[in-house]
């Protein structure tokens, strides 16, 4: 089952989540909205193992990157699983 990876605008562009991901789901892309001029992106969510290492690596108090496991996603959408 696929997991969902959400990057929030509290991302500070530090690259910690990208480096922590064992399956290379995340990458940095240019973004003018933060001091680092880059933000995390999740173009390969189909490869997400659901380990949440990216969440653990995030230094912000707001968890700028969140992994929603497949059962959390279907439950929040009101879908059967």
UniProtKB/Swiss-Prot annotation:
Binding site for [4Fe-4S] cluster 2: 21, 48, 51, 54
Cofactor note: Binds 2 [4Fe-4S] clusters. Cluster 2 is most probably the spectroscopically characterized electron acceptor FA and cluster 1 is most probably FB.
UniProt entry keywords in alphabetical sequence: 4Fe-4S, Chloroplast, Electron transport, Iron, Iron-sulfur, Membrane, Metal-binding, Oxidoreductase, Photosynthesis, Photosystem I, Plastid, Repeat, Thylakoid, Transport
Keyword flag 4Fe-4S: yes
PANTHER family: PHOTOSYSTEM I IRON-SULFUR CENTER (PTHR24960:SF79), PHOTOSYSTEM I IRON-SULFUR CENTER-RELATED (PTHR24960)
Record's function text: Apoprotein for the two 4Fe-4S centers FA and FB of photosystem I (PSI); essential for photochemical activity. FB is the terminal electron acceptor of PSI, donating electrons to ferredoxin. The C-terminus interacts with PsaA/B/D and helps assemble the protein into the PSI complex. Required for binding of PsaD and PsaE to PSI. PSI is a plastocyanin-ferredoxin oxidoreductase, converting photonic excitation into a charge separation, which transfers an electron from the donor P700 chlorophyll pair to the spectroscopically characterized acceptors A0, A1, FX, FA and FB in turn.
Protein name: Photosystem I iron-sulfur center
